[in-house]
């Protein structure tokens, strides 16, 4: 074990002396030189800051031209300088005891060393953007699922070799050191992982862009698998600190909740009183691949301003009261997606979303003002700023931007609204109704009173647009449009709109009355006596007509209010997705089929109104992390056969593998790489679950968030059917009929999603039974890998041979794990849903195992079920009956089984069509077995999957966002 001893503190050179394993004259010289550079650099890296919108600038931004210190060419690390840097950080930025240099300490010292190099480029990138005053994109997301940073950072910097050599000299392997890093618990699933892939591509392609998120102390949760199924505990990933982040105490902004709105003498609104907290920035440098560009992920944490601490209560012994406000502030960033079943949970989620939006918008505006100098032109704001909302969580940035522009900067509503519409854009990630966020109008009004006023103004703008488009003649049609499109659902119609509707109704009534009078006039007798009588009654009629007119006006008002007024028994809600569509200049889906569903179903009325807003941007994944760094052996093979590693930034070159797909030498190398990766999975499974599996079996994997629409239940039902059939056969028949399989699951069920947690429990119960059945042996194993995260995926994906993407058609927006598996030569079985459609087109129909109903059939199939016309396949009924025998334990699965039965009712009637697709699914699995027996054919299919995955690079996606939505250009550092 490598160790070093502590000595005196008389000078820099004698602060500490390493033991004999580390001492050498050359390394001491390099260490001293490195210290000087580092100290100079550290003074300089604090030279940039931006001020709060709500307060004076905290410190002046220094002119970078006057600074001394690093330029990009000062420090070019090699293994010797890397070694000195690691030693330096082991000594001077200690997180552990000084006596021993063990693996955890080696990791932190190595990470700090890498961060030094990142910050050099990070500073240069920031300063160049400042100097050039470029248009910059800002990506707001509640999640960033980054994974481990060490291997990714040194890979992008081109320093893998020097760091591996340096750590070898210190007695460790780079891989062992990298495994000490905990995954950053800043996300959960595809939404957050996509955001992280996008940041990697933005930096690699030299686009001026930043990410904004929240710094969650405990993440979503750490998943434990026990005899009771899934259990959740806090994920304390920050316990030992995060070496990749830089706390920016010089950058903080006030964030307000509650309070009231006051109108000043000049008509400007002021949001006063309430509860104030402070959002503090933590910066994480994001390096591009083989480029100097290093962009920023700015994360916000929350605290109470010192002046708000109740010192009087504390000194009087009421410590709980004194600390109450601090706890309320801090808990905003404790947990990702806190449970929202309670009012407190809903309030906390809204506070999270608003904190992200408010702090980020204040920061963006401060940067715009700083770069504009003394000539701030707000009409130029959209020419310098693009804000992308990753799903509906950052929706509050719309009213927040309007609030700042109007209430703080003094712009008119018209000008602020135009600027906002040109600035923000919205990515839709779901067609699930429950995921299209709706918030209580009352709760939002209490928490953010000014923002509800602004949202009401946007809603009023929308209503006038709808009236202009559809007119007021057909009130039934108009009511239908408002019900589908309003932002404020079941809320009073604005008076300006109400007056128009009442006037229109009165005009219609007048026209109708005039027609009736004309008809009556034609039928009158022209006799003189009647004329005389009419003259006598004229005065009386005029008085009566006045009264009738008043009644008719009242009737018109009552009619309009009855048709368009709020219903007392319905909740008043704010539709956040509608707010995004109305306010943004672009709305995009994330796969071709999803974007069509968005236009034709989810937002069809808006699409009719503004077809030019709607776009498709099929998702992608970074080939650096998801092929090169996690699967280096396969990457070397690809580089060899394509002639260079250009495919890492130009994935179209992967398509060149197609011409070698039948080459026996390539196939042999390909199978060997896959086999080596499978051995890593064997080790992972043993470590995480205790199960021992055979590397000779097919590795069949489904790893994703546990949800009914993703249909892990269909997968495990297929496994149960397979197991039952095996049990009915002789050993010889089993071996002939079935290919050995290891069926691997991974993913988290939300803590409050009971049915998803039942599915986890069922999978683990099936595994417990099957894995201990001596008759079955290695023919079938079922494994649930606990606490699925990016690092687990980086082991499972390279060694997988079949991956399941089997969601109910039309319900998965895109998916990105399907892209990662395909890129690593894994074959897919799936429905025509999300990105599966496009993957199948690129890899070839014969190289994708397709089954199941299609998206356009789903509504009809559900209707058929509701009418009692669906007849389940006997094999599906056989599986359910087998489960009910108790073969998988004593747990009561009636609630789970019940969701698949009946024709109607909440939580019943097989809404996700497991029973409908089951027979097609198991027959498709037979085709998988047949194909796998021919390993030459299977390997060719695997190669063609990698070759066809070229389209699904996040680089392609980001180019499209930059060109079509953000309108930004690459900016390469000199």
Curated annotation (Swiss-Prot):
Keywords: Allosteric enzyme, Amyloplast, Carbohydrate metabolism, Chloroplast, Glycosyltransferase, Plastid, Pyridoxal phosphate, Transferase, Transit peptide. The keyword Cytoplasm does not apply. Leaves. Its EC number is 2.4.1.1. Residues 517-532 have a biased composition (Acidic residues). The modification N6-(pyridoxal phosphate)lysine is found at residue 820. It comes from the Eukaryota. One of its GO terms (cellular component) is chloroplast. GO terms for molecular function: glycogen phosphorylase activity; pyridoxal phosphate binding. InterPro entries: Glycg_phsphrylas (IPR011833), Glyco_trans_35 (IPR000811), Pyridoxal_P_attach_site (IPR035090). Its main location: plastid. It is found in: Plastid, Chloroplast; Plastid, Amyloplast. It is an enzyme of class 2 (transferase). Its cofactor is pyridoxal 5'-phosphate. The keyword Repressor does not apply. GO terms for biological process: glycogen catabolic process. It catalyses: [(1->4)-alpha-D-glucosyl](n) + phosphate = [(1->4)-alpha-D-glucosyl](n-1) + alpha-D-glucose 1-phosphate. Phosphorylase is an important allosteric enzyme in carbohydrate metabolism. Enzymes from different sources differ in their regulatory mechanisms and in their natural substrates. However, all known phosphorylases share catalytic and structural properties. Belongs to the glycogen phosphorylase family. PANTHER family: ALPHA-1,4 GLUCAN PHOSPHORYLASE L-2 ISOZYME, CHLOROPLASTIC_AMYLOPLASTIC, GLYCOGEN PHOSPHORYLASE. This is Alpha-1,4 glucan phosphorylase L-2 isozyme, chloroplastic/amyloplastic. It comes from Solanum tuberosum (Potato). The lineage of its organism: Eukaryota, Viridiplantae, Streptophyta, Embryophyta, Tracheophyta. The gene is STP-1.
């Amino acid at each position: 074990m490598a160790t070093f001893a502590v000595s005196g503190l008389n000078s820099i050179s004698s602060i500490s002396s390493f033991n004999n394993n580390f001492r050498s004259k050359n390394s001491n010289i390099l260490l001293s030189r490195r210290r000087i550079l580092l100290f100079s650099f550290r003074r300089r890296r604090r030279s940039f800051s931006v001020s709060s919108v709500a307060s004076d600038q905290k410190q002046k931004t220094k002119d970078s031209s006057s600074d001394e210190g690093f330029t990009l060419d000062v420090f070019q690390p090699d293994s010797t300088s890397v070694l000195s840097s690691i030693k330096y950080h082991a000594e001077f930025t200690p997180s552990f005891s000084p006596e021993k240099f063990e693996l955890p300490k080696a990791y932190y010292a190595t990470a700090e060393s890498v961060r030094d190099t990142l910050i050099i480029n990070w500073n240069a990138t920031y300063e160049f953007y400042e100097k050039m005053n470029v248009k910059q994109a800002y990506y707001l997301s509640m999640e960033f699922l980054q994974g481990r940073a060490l291997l990714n950072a040194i890979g992008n910097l081109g320093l893998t070799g020097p760091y591996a050599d340096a750590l070898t000299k210190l007695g460790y392997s780079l891989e062992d050191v990298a495994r000490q890093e905990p995954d950053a618990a800043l996300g959960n699933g595809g939404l957050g992982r996509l955001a992280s892939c996008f940041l990697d591509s933005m930096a690699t392609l030299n686009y001026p862009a930043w990410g904004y998120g929240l710094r969650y102390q405990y993440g979503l949760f750490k998943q434990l698998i026990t005899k009771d199924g899934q259990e959740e505990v806090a994920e304390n990933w920050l316990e030992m600190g995060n070496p990749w982040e830089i706390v920016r105490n010089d950058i903080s902004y006030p964030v307000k909740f509650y309070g009231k709105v006051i109108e000043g003498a000049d008509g400007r609104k002021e949001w006063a009183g309430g509860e104030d907290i402070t959002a503090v920035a933590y910066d994480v440098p994001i390096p591009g691949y083989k480029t100097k560009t290093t962009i920023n992920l700015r994360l916000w944490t929350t605290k109470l301003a010192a002046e708000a601490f109740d010192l009087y209560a504390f000194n009087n012994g009421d410590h709980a009261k004194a600390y109450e406000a601090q706890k309320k502030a801090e808990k905003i960033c404790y947990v990702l997606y806190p449970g929202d079943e309670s009012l407190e949970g809903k309030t906390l989620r809204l506070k999270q979303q608003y904190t992200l939006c408010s702090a980020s918008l204040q920061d963006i505006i401060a940067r715009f003002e700083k770069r504009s100098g003394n000539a701030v032109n707000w009409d130029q704001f959209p020419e310098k700023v693009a804000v992308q909302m990753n799903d509906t969580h950052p929706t509050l940035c719309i009213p927040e931007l309007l609030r700042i522009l109007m209430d703080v900067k003094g712009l008119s509503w018209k000008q602020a609204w135009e600027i906002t519409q040109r600035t923000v854009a919205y990515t839709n990630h779901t067609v699930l109704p429950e995921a299209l966020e709706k918030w209580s109008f009352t709760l939002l009004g209490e928490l953010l009173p000014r923002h509800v006023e602004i949202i009401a103004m946007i809603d009023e703008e929308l209503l006038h647009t709808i009236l202009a488009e559809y007119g007021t003649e057909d009130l039934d049609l108009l009511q239908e449009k408002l019900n589908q499109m309003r932002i404020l659902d079941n809320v009073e119609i604005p008076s300006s709109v109400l007056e128009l509707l009442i006037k229109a109704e009165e005009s219609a009534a007048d026209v109708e009355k005039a027609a009736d009078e004309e008809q009556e006039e034609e039928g009158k007798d022209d006799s003189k006596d009647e004329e005389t009588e009419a003259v006598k009654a004229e005065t009386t009629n005029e008085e009566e007509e006045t009264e009738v007119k008043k009644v008719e006006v009242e009737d018109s008002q009552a009619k309009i209010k009855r048709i368009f007024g709020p219903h007392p028994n319905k909740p008043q809600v704010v539709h956040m997705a509608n707010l995004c569509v109305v306010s943004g200049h672009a709305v995009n889906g994330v796969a071709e089929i999803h974007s069509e569903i968005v236009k034709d179903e989810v937002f069809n009325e808006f699409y009719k109104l503004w077809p030019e807003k709607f776009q498709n941007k099929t998702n992608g994944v970074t080939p650096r992390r998801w092929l090169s760094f996690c699967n280096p052996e396969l990457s070397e093979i690809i580089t060899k056969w394509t002639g260079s590693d250009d495919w890492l930034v130009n994935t179209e070159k992967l398509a060149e593998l197609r011409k070698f797909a039948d080459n026996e030498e390539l196939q042999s190398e390909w199978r060997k790489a896959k086999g080596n990766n499978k051995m890593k999975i064997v080790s992972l499974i043993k470590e995480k679950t205790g199960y021992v599996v055979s590397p000779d079996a097919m590795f069949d994997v489904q790893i994703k968030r546990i949800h009914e629409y993703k249909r892990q239940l269909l997968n495990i039902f297929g496994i149960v059917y397979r197991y039952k059939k095996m049990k009915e056969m002789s050993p010889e028949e089993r071996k002939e009929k079935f290919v050995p399989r290891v069926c691997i699951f991974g993913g988290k069920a939300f803590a409050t999603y009971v049915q998803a947690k039942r599915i986890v429990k069922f999978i683990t119960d099936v595994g417990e039974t099957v894995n201990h059945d001596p008759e079955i042996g290695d023919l079938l194993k079922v494994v649930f890998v606990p606490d699925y995260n990016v690092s687990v995926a980086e082991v499972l994906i390279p060694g997988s041979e079949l991956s399941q993407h089997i969601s109910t058609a039309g319900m998965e927006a895109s998916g990105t794990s399907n892209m990662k598996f395909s890129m690593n030569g894994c074959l897919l079985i799936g429905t025509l849903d999300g990105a599966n459609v496009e993957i199948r087109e690129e890899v070839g129909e014969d190289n994708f195992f397709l089954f199941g109903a299609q998206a356009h059939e789903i509504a009809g199939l559900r209707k058929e079920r509701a009418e009692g016309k669906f007849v389940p396949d006997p094999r599906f009924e056989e599986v359910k009956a087998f489960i009910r025998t108790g073969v998988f334990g004593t747990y009561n699965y009636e609630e789970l089984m019940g969701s698949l039965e009946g024709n109607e009712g909440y939580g019943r009637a097989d809404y996700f069509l497991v029973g409908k697709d089951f027979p097609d699914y198991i027959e498709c699995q037979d085709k998988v077995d047949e194909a796998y027996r021919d390993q030459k054919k299977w390997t060719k299919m695997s190669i063609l999957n990698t070759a066809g995955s070229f389209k699904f690079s996040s680089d392609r996606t980001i180019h499209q966002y930059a060109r079509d939505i953000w309108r930004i250009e690459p900016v390469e550092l000199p």
